[in-house]
Amino acid sequence: MTEEYKKVYLTCNVSEGQFSNESAVSMEDYQGGKYSGFFNNNSIKDGKLEVKIWDEKENLVLVGLPGRLLEVPGAGDYITVKREQIDIEN
């Protein structure tokens, strides 16, 4: 039996990137901190960024990003957000 893969999206603000294949994306963490980065357009759907859930605890979700955040050098490929910021595609 195989597990069904569901796409998970993070609510964010999307604007035009520097190149035709990317968009500038800004988002908030669970504490209201502001973060941004440039992400491939293939990772964006209806103004939301496709992410992977790494961990969940109560109403918080640690998500992996399909790229790096500008404000977090090194380990900027994940962010903790509120569950209400996440949409799971059926």
Regions found by a protein language model. Give the residues of each.
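Basic/aromatic-rich interaction segments and small domains that mediate binding to polyanionic partners
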Residues: 3-86
